[in-house]
UniProtKB/Swiss-Prot annotation:
Listed transmembrane segments: none
Designated name of the protein: Calcium-dependent protein kinase 4
Family: Belongs to the protein kinase superfamily. Ser/Thr protein kinase family. CDPK subfamily.
A GO BP entry: positive regulation of abscisic acid-activated signaling pathway
Gene encoding the protein: CPK4
Organism, as annotated: Arabidopsis thaliana (Mouse-ear cress)
Positions of post-translational Phosphoserine modification: 189
Length: 501
């Protein structure tokens, strides 16, 4: 990597000047799209070696805290880069538009996807995987780093080979901490968040909880705390009992269940540490975890759970933009009140000022979470459709006449079915590139005829999934946009196309 110049330009993320990325790398295909940036394959000109380049648009960094978050992520990646199961950072670059993080490329796919594609899976394999994950957690904690967003999507295999290494890849929510220090901001992903995070007072023990949730899912195909809504999920996390009675748990070893119990203890003080978990007999003794394949139903559930339903997300946006004045209530006026420059979009500063005007005392990090959750297309602003989708009551969204409107949007030729070509067209319109359409169809296509009819579409829309791949929670127990502005549900069944003029 080029030696950085220690002079820091104004309005920059990095505390030093850097060479131009394109002087040293050729950018290739897009590998993935995240909440804050896009990852590309890149090739180093001097060596022809391939790397991954995460490019973060600076327009999405709307406050000084965002700049500090990116710089902290880079520092933490350097801090952990010698660990064999952490993606190694190669270098950082910055120009007037982007911050680029060049790192080791992982071409073996996500944790759950690899398991599903293998077609069989055993307790012993689960023990090896969770040992790797706990090893990363132990390393983080020993170096004074709290991850705060452990989930399967943040673990990739470095190659497609059978002996590929599992590597932690995303440290965007990670922070440095001191022993005995507590944090208070609500971050993470719904299924994996620890109860003390929801109570807004927590320490590094939250990472062990998240790893325990991953282990439960590895062995059963479903999360331990489940509900139709995110607020329901959080209630289960705070109060629910762990289910070890349903299939496949009667066939799972007592050692596995004992470790999960200890990792999912609601008391952080009683919860097992990462080091103690690594010393648990189920992990240490290679014969304690049986090598026989788990029930195939586990893999089936795992596949369903690991796929975010993008069609549902698009459909909610379509419905939100077609509701009537009466059904929308005062939301149009609220949008116009927040959008002070009448640009048709809400920026972070406008959202913050709007919340202040209605007497909200949310912290800046919480407002940023609201912004991220509502920004469906990752543009860095909230347009009118996104605002409605974030603030309207779900009962309005699920009314049949609104579902008909949404279905018709996808069913371009009016055949009564959504085909893969029509889905491709919709994805293009929504800017969802490189989306596995076959998997999206199969997820909803109950009769396996290769297309989606209205009854299948309706079942999908009314099914609670709660799966979120964003770095923040869409609706948590403490706040969402609707609650922040005091928006209440009103009853109406009319519909029409409307937008603020």
């Amino acid at each position: 990597m080029e030696k950085p110049n220690p002079r820091r330009p104004s309005n920059s993320v990095l505390p030093y000047e850097t060479p131009r990325l394109r002087d040293h790398y050729l950018l290739g295909k897009k590998l993935g799209q995240g909440q804050f940036g896009t990852t590309y394959l890149c090739t180093e000109k001097s060596s022809s070696a391939n790397y991954a380049c995460k490019s973060i648009p600076k327009r999405k960094l709307v406050c000084r805290e965002d700049y500090e978050d990116v710089w902290r992520e880079i520092q933490i990646m350097h801090h952990l880069s010698e660990h064999p199961n952490v993606v190694r950072i190669k270098g950082t670059y910055e120009d007037s538009v982007f911050v680029h993080i060049v790192m080791e490329v992982c071409e073996g796919g996500e944790l759950f996807d690899r398991i599903v594609s293998k077609g069989c899976f055993s307790e012993r394999e689960a023990a090896k995987l969770i040992k790797t994950i706990l090893g990363v957690v132990e390393a983080c904690h020993s170096l004074g780093v709290m991850h705060r967003d452990l989930k399967p999507e943040n673990f990739l295999f470095d190659s497609p080979s059978d002996d590929a290494k599992l590597k932690a890849t995303d440290f965007g929510l990670s922070v440095f901490y001191k022993p005995g220090q507590y944090l208070y901001d609500v971050v993470g992903s719904p299924y994996y968040v620890a109860p003390e995070v929801l109570k807004k007072c927590y320490g590094p023990e939250i990472d062990v909880w998240s790893a325990g949730v991953i282990l439960y899912i590895l062995l059963s195909g479903v999360p331990p705390f489940w509900a139709e809504t995110e607020s329901g999920i959080f209630r289960q996390i705070l109060q629910g009992k762990i289910d070890f009675k349903s299939d496949p748990w009667p066939t799972i070893s007592e050692g596995a269940k004992d470790l999960i119990y200890k990792m999912l203890d609601r008391s952080p003080k009683k919860r097992i540490s990462a080091h103690e978990a690594l010393c648990h007999p189920w992990i240490v003794d290679e014969h304690a975890a049986p090598d026989k394949p788990l029930d195939p139903a586990v893999l089936s559930r795992l596949k369903q759970f690991s796929q975010m339903n993008k069609i549902k997300k698009m459909a909610l946006r379509v419905i939100a933009e077609r509701l009537s004045e009466e059904e929308i209530g005062g939301l149009k006026e609220l949008f116009k009140m927040i959008d002070t420059d009448n640009s048709g979009t809400i920026t972070f500063e406008e959202l913050k000022a709007g919340l202040k005007r209605v007497g909200s005392e949310l912290m800046e990090s919480e407002i940023k979470s609201l912004m991220d959750a509502a920004d469906i297309d990752n543009s860095g602003t909230i347009d009118y459709g996104e605002f409605l989708a974030a603030t309207l009551h779900i009962n309005k969204m699920e009314r049949e006449e609104n579902l008909v409107v949404a279905f018709s949007y996808f069913d371009k030729d009016g055949s009564g079915y959504i085909t893969i070509d029509e889905l491709q067209q919709a994805c293009t319109e929504f800017g969802l590139c490189d989306t596995p359409l076959d998997d999206m169809i199969k997820e909803i296509d109950l009769d396996n005829d290769g297309k989606i009819d209205f009854s299948e579409f309706t079942a999908m829309m009314k099914k609670g999934d709660g799966v979120g791949r964003s770095r923040t929670m869409r609706n948590n127990l403490n706040f969402n946009i609707a609650e922040a502005f005091g928006v209440e549900d009103t009853s109406s069944t009319a519909k029409s196309d409307d937008s603020p003029k």
